[in-house]
Amino acid sequence: NDYLLISQAPAFALLERLDQIDPAFLIALCRKAAGYEAIPGASDITADLATRDLHPILSTDPRRAARIALPTDGSRPDMPAFSDRAFDGWMQAQRPANLPQDLPFLGFGLYGEKRSVYTAAQFADAASEERRTRHLGIDIFAPAGTAIHAPLDGVVESVTYNADPLDYGHTLILRHATAQGRPFFTLYGHLGGSLPGLCTPGQAIKAGDLIAHLGDWHENGGWAPHLHLQVVTSLLTQAGNFFGVGHDSLWDTWADISPDANLLLRLEPESFRLDPEPPEALLALRQKVIGPSLSVSYREKLKIVRGRGAWLIDHTGRRYLDTVNNITHVGHCHPHVVAAIARQ
Protein backbone atom coordinates (compact mmCIF):
# COMPACT_ATOMS: atom_id res chain seq x y z
CA ASN A 1 0.00 0.00 0.00
CA ASP A 2 0.97 3.65 -0.29
CA TYR A 3 1.89 3.93 3.40
CA LEU A 4 4.39 1.06 3.21
CA LEU A 5 5.89 2.37 -0.02
CA ILE A 6 6.45 5.80 1.54
CA SER A 7 8.03 4.39 4.70
CA GLN A 8 10.22 1.91 2.79
CA ALA A 9 11.68 4.46 0.36
CA PRO A 10 14.26 5.92 2.79
CA ALA A 11 15.29 2.42 3.87
CA PHE A 12 15.97 1.34 0.30
CA ALA A 13 17.82 4.61 -0.37
CA LEU A 14 20.05 3.91 2.64
CA LEU A 15 20.73 0.35 1.48
CA GLU A 16 21.73 1.63 -1.97
CA ARG A 17 24.09 4.14 -0.37
CA LEU A 18 25.63 1.53 1.94
CA ASP A 19 26.16 -0.76 -1.05
CA GLN A 20 28.51 1.86 -2.53
CA ILE A 21 30.78 1.91 0.54
CA ASP A 22 33.65 -0.50 1.17
CA PRO A 23 32.10 -3.01 3.62
CA ALA A 24 35.35 -3.33 5.55
CA PHE A 25 35.33 0.44 6.06
CA LEU A 26 31.80 0.21 7.48
CA ILE A 27 33.06 -2.41 9.95
CA ALA A 28 35.95 -0.11 10.88
CA LEU A 29 33.49 2.75 11.51
CA CYS A 30 31.33 0.55 13.73
CA ARG A 31 34.34 -0.70 15.69
CA LYS A 32 35.54 2.87 16.32
CA ALA A 33 32.05 3.99 17.37
CA ALA A 34 31.96 1.10 19.86
CA GLY A 35 35.23 2.18 21.46
CA TYR A 36 37.56 -0.28 19.74
CA GLU A 37 40.41 0.26 17.30
CA ALA A 38 39.04 0.69 13.80
CA ILE A 39 41.47 -1.99 12.62
CA PRO A 40 42.29 -4.79 15.10
CA GLY A 41 45.95 -4.54 16.09
CA ALA A 42 46.53 -1.09 14.56
CA SER A 43 48.35 0.08 17.70
CA ASP A 44 50.53 -3.07 17.62
CA ILE A 45 51.62 -2.16 14.09
CA THR A 46 52.57 1.42 15.02
CA ALA A 47 54.42 0.18 18.11
CA ASP A 48 56.35 -2.31 15.99
CA LEU A 49 57.30 0.32 13.39
CA ALA A 50 58.49 2.70 16.10
CA THR A 51 61.22 0.21 17.10
CA ARG A 52 62.21 -1.17 13.67
CA ASP A 53 65.59 -0.63 12.03
CA LEU A 54 64.67 1.13 8.78
CA HIS A 55 66.54 1.83 5.56
CA PRO A 56 66.27 5.40 4.20
CA ILE A 57 63.60 5.79 1.51
CA LEU A 58 65.98 7.85 -0.66
CA SER A 59 69.65 7.35 -1.50
CA THR A 60 70.41 10.32 0.76
CA ASP A 61 68.76 9.95 4.15
CA PRO A 62 65.97 12.58 4.18
CA ARG A 63 66.87 13.40 7.79
CA ARG A 64 70.19 14.85 6.60
CA ALA A 65 69.03 16.58 3.41
CA ALA A 66 68.24 20.25 2.93
CA ARG A 67 64.48 20.62 2.96
CA ILE A 68 61.42 22.84 3.07
CA ALA A 69 58.00 22.27 4.65
CA LEU A 70 55.11 22.64 2.19
CA PRO A 71 51.88 23.31 4.11
CA THR A 72 48.87 24.12 1.94
CA ASP A 73 47.05 26.18 4.57
CA GLY A 74 47.98 29.51 2.98
CA SER A 75 51.07 30.12 5.10
CA ARG A 76 53.06 30.06 1.83
CA PRO A 77 50.81 32.38 -0.21
CA ASP A 78 53.14 32.40 -3.25
CA MET A 79 53.30 28.59 -3.53
CA PRO A 80 51.41 27.16 -6.55
CA ALA A 81 49.20 24.11 -6.07
CA PHE A 82 50.94 20.74 -6.32
CA SER A 83 48.87 20.10 -9.48
CA ASP A 84 50.01 23.39 -11.08
CA ARG A 85 53.00 23.06 -13.42
CA ALA A 86 54.30 26.37 -12.08
CA PHE A 87 55.14 24.50 -8.87
CA ASP A 88 58.34 23.06 -10.38
CA GLY A 89 59.81 26.51 -10.98
CA TRP A 90 58.69 27.74 -7.56
CA MET A 91 60.31 24.76 -5.85
CA GLN A 92 63.57 25.29 -7.73
CA ALA A 93 63.58 28.94 -6.61
CA GLN A 94 63.46 27.82 -2.96
CA ARG A 95 66.67 25.81 -3.27
CA PRO A 96 69.51 27.39 -1.24
CA ALA A 97 71.89 29.15 -3.62
CA ASN A 98 75.02 27.58 -2.12
CA LEU A 99 73.70 24.00 -2.00
CA PRO A 100 75.86 21.84 -4.32
CA GLN A 101 73.92 20.54 -7.30
CA ASP A 102 74.73 16.93 -6.43
CA LEU A 103 72.96 17.23 -3.06
CA PRO A 104 69.17 16.84 -2.83
CA PHE A 105 66.71 19.53 -1.84
CA LEU A 106 63.45 18.03 -0.61
CA GLY A 107 59.96 19.31 0.08
CA PHE A 108 57.66 17.66 2.62
CA GLY A 109 53.87 17.61 2.36
CA LEU A 110 52.06 17.05 5.64
CA TYR A 111 50.23 14.04 7.05
CA GLY A 112 46.73 14.78 8.33
CA GLU A 113 46.53 18.11 6.52
CA LYS A 114 43.18 19.30 5.14
CA ARG A 115 43.61 20.21 1.46
CA SER A 116 41.35 21.88 -1.09
CA VAL A 117 43.15 20.46 -4.15
CA TYR A 118 41.21 17.17 -4.20
CA THR A 119 38.44 18.16 -6.59
CA ALA A 120 38.32 15.11 -8.88
CA ALA A 121 35.35 12.72 -8.77
CA GLN A 122 37.26 9.93 -7.03
CA PHE A 123 37.51 12.03 -3.84
CA ALA A 124 33.74 11.98 -3.28
CA ASP A 125 31.88 8.89 -2.09
CA ALA A 126 28.76 7.66 -0.33
CA ALA A 127 30.36 7.30 3.11
CA SER A 128 29.80 10.98 3.85
CA GLU A 129 28.35 14.08 2.23
CA GLU A 130 31.73 15.76 2.63
CA ARG A 131 34.57 15.12 0.20
CA ARG A 132 37.67 13.29 1.32
CA THR A 133 40.21 16.07 1.83
CA ARG A 134 42.49 15.05 4.71
CA HIS A 135 45.87 13.69 3.64
CA LEU A 136 46.68 10.13 4.75
CA GLY A 137 50.34 10.08 3.75
CA ILE A 138 53.48 12.19 3.64
CA ASP A 139 54.64 13.74 0.36
CA ILE A 140 58.35 13.91 -0.48
CA PHE A 141 59.00 16.33 -3.35
CA ALA A 142 62.16 15.62 -5.35
CA PRO A 143 63.12 15.58 -9.04
CA ALA A 144 61.53 13.05 -11.39
CA GLY A 145 63.70 9.95 -11.64
CA THR A 146 64.80 10.05 -7.99
CA ALA A 147 65.44 6.49 -6.77
CA ILE A 148 63.10 5.03 -4.12
CA HIS A 149 64.29 2.26 -1.77
CA ALA A 150 62.33 -0.14 0.42
CA PRO A 151 62.44 0.92 4.08
CA LEU A 152 62.02 -2.66 5.36
CA ASP A 153 61.65 -6.24 4.17
CA GLY A 154 58.41 -7.18 2.48
CA VAL A 155 56.62 -8.76 -0.46
CA VAL A 156 55.15 -6.96 -3.46
CA GLU A 157 51.37 -6.91 -2.96
CA SER A 158 50.47 -5.06 -6.17
CA VAL A 159 51.89 -3.03 -9.06
CA THR A 160 49.22 -0.89 -10.72
CA TYR A 161 48.80 2.10 -13.01
CA ASN A 162 45.93 4.23 -11.68
CA ALA A 163 45.25 6.45 -14.67
CA ASP A 164 42.51 8.81 -13.45
CA PRO A 165 43.47 12.51 -13.34
CA LEU A 166 44.95 13.42 -9.94
CA ASP A 167 45.21 9.73 -9.00
CA TYR A 168 48.50 7.98 -8.15
CA GLY A 169 49.67 7.05 -11.64
CA HIS A 170 52.14 4.18 -11.18
CA THR A 171 51.47 2.71 -7.72
CA LEU A 172 53.31 0.13 -5.60
CA ILE A 173 51.95 -1.57 -2.48
CA LEU A 174 54.25 -3.73 -0.33
CA ARG A 175 53.09 -6.20 2.31
CA HIS A 176 55.03 -6.48 5.58
CA ALA A 177 54.59 -8.19 8.94
CA THR A 178 55.27 -7.19 12.53
CA ALA A 179 57.52 -9.27 14.77
CA GLN A 180 54.34 -11.04 15.92
CA GLY A 181 53.31 -11.78 12.32
CA ARG A 182 50.54 -9.18 11.96
CA PRO A 183 50.36 -7.96 8.33
CA PHE A 184 50.44 -4.32 7.26
CA PHE A 185 51.24 -2.44 4.06
CA THR A 186 53.19 0.51 2.69
CA LEU A 187 51.99 2.42 -0.37
CA TYR A 188 54.16 4.38 -2.81
CA GLY A 189 52.28 6.63 -5.24
CA HIS A 190 53.17 8.89 -8.21
CA LEU A 191 55.97 6.62 -9.45
CA GLY A 192 57.71 6.41 -12.81
CA GLY A 193 57.32 3.96 -15.67
CA SER A 194 60.30 1.91 -14.47
CA LEU A 195 58.10 0.36 -11.74
CA PRO A 196 56.83 -2.74 -13.65
CA GLY A 197 60.42 -3.66 -14.52
CA LEU A 198 61.55 -3.41 -10.90
CA CYS A 199 58.69 -5.06 -9.02
CA THR A 200 56.22 -7.86 -9.74
CA PRO A 201 53.46 -9.18 -7.45
CA GLY A 202 54.75 -11.84 -5.05
CA GLN A 203 58.37 -10.70 -5.35
CA ALA A 204 60.36 -10.71 -2.10
CA ILE A 205 61.87 -7.32 -1.23
CA LYS A 206 64.75 -6.62 1.14
CA ALA A 207 65.23 -3.35 3.04
CA GLY A 208 67.29 -1.03 0.85
CA ASP A 209 66.29 -2.62 -2.47
CA LEU A 210 65.60 -0.23 -5.34
CA ILE A 211 61.84 -0.46 -5.83
CA ALA A 212 60.90 2.53 -7.99
CA HIS A 213 61.73 6.00 -9.33
CA LEU A 214 59.70 9.17 -8.98
CA GLY A 215 57.39 9.77 -11.93
CA ASP A 216 57.03 12.94 -13.99
CA TRP A 217 53.78 14.79 -14.71
CA HIS A 218 52.67 12.60 -17.63
CA GLU A 219 52.88 9.33 -15.66
CA ASN A 220 52.19 10.21 -12.01
CA GLY A 221 48.57 11.37 -12.16
CA GLY A 222 49.30 14.98 -13.11
CA TRP A 223 51.25 16.22 -10.08
CA ALA A 224 54.59 17.89 -9.46
CA PRO A 225 57.10 15.02 -9.05
CA HIS A 226 56.87 13.63 -5.54
CA LEU A 227 56.42 10.42 -3.58
CA HIS A 228 53.17 9.83 -1.72
CA LEU A 229 54.24 7.54 1.14
CA GLN A 230 51.55 5.89 3.25
CA VAL A 231 51.30 3.25 5.96
CA VAL A 232 48.16 1.08 5.74
CA THR A 233 47.10 -1.24 8.55
CA SER A 234 44.39 -2.86 6.39
CA LEU A 235 43.64 -2.61 2.67
CA LEU A 236 39.95 -3.12 3.51
CA THR A 237 38.56 -4.66 0.30
CA GLN A 238 40.69 -2.52 -2.04
CA ALA A 239 43.19 -3.94 -4.55
CA GLY A 240 45.87 -2.10 -6.54
CA ASN A 241 44.84 1.28 -5.16
CA PHE A 242 43.93 2.75 -1.80
CA PHE A 243 42.44 5.91 -0.35
CA GLY A 244 45.09 8.64 -0.10
CA VAL A 245 42.81 11.10 1.66
CA GLY A 246 40.05 10.61 4.22
CA HIS A 247 37.00 12.45 5.57
CA ASP A 248 37.79 15.07 8.18
CA SER A 249 34.74 14.12 10.27
CA LEU A 250 35.84 10.46 10.29
CA TRP A 251 39.51 11.16 10.97
CA ASP A 252 39.74 9.02 14.10
CA THR A 253 38.83 5.99 11.97
CA TRP A 254 41.11 6.92 9.08
CA ALA A 255 44.04 7.50 11.46
CA ASP A 256 43.77 3.87 12.62
CA ILE A 257 43.69 2.71 9.00
CA SER A 258 46.63 4.90 7.91
CA PRO A 259 48.80 6.13 10.81
CA ASP A 260 51.47 8.78 10.33
CA ALA A 261 53.96 7.72 7.64
CA ASN A 262 56.70 9.49 9.60
CA LEU A 263 56.98 6.13 11.35
CA LEU A 264 58.98 5.18 8.22
CA LEU A 265 60.96 8.43 7.88
CA ARG A 266 61.55 9.50 11.50
CA LEU A 267 61.91 13.13 10.56
CA GLU A 268 62.07 15.78 13.24
CA PRO A 269 58.79 17.67 13.83
CA GLU A 270 60.39 20.88 12.53
CA SER A 271 60.40 19.26 9.06
CA PHE A 272 56.64 19.78 8.84
CA ARG A 273 56.16 23.34 10.08
CA LEU A 274 57.27 26.85 9.25
CA ASP A 275 59.47 28.74 11.69
CA PRO A 276 57.99 32.18 12.49
CA GLU A 277 61.53 33.49 13.12
CA PRO A 278 63.74 32.30 10.24
CA PRO A 279 67.53 32.73 10.41
CA GLU A 280 67.41 35.94 8.35
CA ALA A 281 65.20 37.67 10.94
CA LEU A 282 67.40 36.57 13.84
CA LEU A 283 70.54 37.66 11.98
CA ALA A 284 69.09 41.14 11.42
CA LEU A 285 68.28 41.41 15.14
CA ARG A 286 71.73 40.12 16.07
CA GLN A 287 73.42 42.77 13.94
CA LYS A 288 71.53 45.44 15.89
CA VAL A 289 72.33 44.25 19.41
CA ILE A 290 75.60 42.26 19.25
CA GLY A 291 79.01 43.60 18.32
CA PRO A 292 80.82 42.41 15.18
CA SER A 293 83.60 40.81 17.25
CA LEU A 294 81.24 37.87 17.84
CA SER A 295 81.06 36.33 14.39
CA VAL A 296 78.60 33.87 12.87
CA SER A 297 79.79 30.77 11.05
CA TYR A 298 78.84 29.60 7.54
CA ARG A 299 77.69 31.50 4.47
CA GLU A 300 74.18 30.06 4.89
CA LYS A 301 73.47 30.82 8.54
CA LEU A 302 72.20 27.98 10.70
CA LYS A 303 69.48 28.27 13.30
CA ILE A 304 69.98 25.35 15.67
CA VAL A 305 66.86 24.78 17.77
CA ARG A 306 67.83 21.66 19.73
CA GLY A 307 70.04 18.60 19.90
CA ARG A 308 69.55 14.86 20.08
CA GLY A 309 72.32 12.34 20.59
CA ALA A 310 75.26 13.28 18.37
CA TRP A 311 73.11 15.54 16.20
CA LEU A 312 72.20 19.22 16.15
CA ILE A 313 68.82 19.98 14.57
CA ASP A 314 68.01 23.19 12.71
CA HIS A 315 64.70 25.02 12.31
CA THR A 316 63.79 22.92 9.25
CA GLY A 317 64.41 19.61 11.03
CA ARG A 318 67.68 18.94 9.18
CA ARG A 319 70.31 17.09 11.21
CA TYR A 320 73.97 18.13 11.50
CA LEU A 321 76.61 15.90 13.09
CA ASP A 322 78.03 17.78 16.09
CA THR A 323 81.83 17.43 16.01
CA VAL A 324 82.49 20.52 18.18
CA ASN A 325 80.72 20.28 21.54
CA ASN A 326 81.89 17.99 24.34
CA ILE A 327 78.29 17.09 25.21
CA THR A 328 78.26 14.61 22.31
CA HIS A 329 80.37 12.24 24.46
CA VAL A 330 77.12 11.41 26.25
CA GLY A 331 74.73 12.88 23.68
CA HIS A 332 72.54 15.96 23.53
CA CYS A 333 69.42 15.61 25.70
CA HIS A 334 70.73 12.45 27.37
CA PRO A 335 67.88 11.44 29.71
CA HIS A 336 70.18 10.85 32.71
CA VAL A 337 71.84 14.26 32.28
CA VAL A 338 68.47 15.98 31.84
CA ALA A 339 67.14 14.28 34.99
CA ALA A 340 70.22 15.29 37.00
CA ILE A 341 69.89 18.92 35.91
CA ALA A 342 66.21 18.89 36.84
CA ARG A 343 67.00 17.52 40.31
CA GLN A 344 69.72 20.11 40.91
Model regions and ranges:
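Short loop/turn microsegments at loop-to-beta-strand junctions
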Residues: 145-146, 300, 306-310, 316
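Glycine-rich loop-to-alpha-helix module at the N-terminal edge of alpha/beta enzyme cores
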Residues: 320-344
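Zn2+-dependent peptidoglycan hydrolase active-site motif and core
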Residues: 150-195
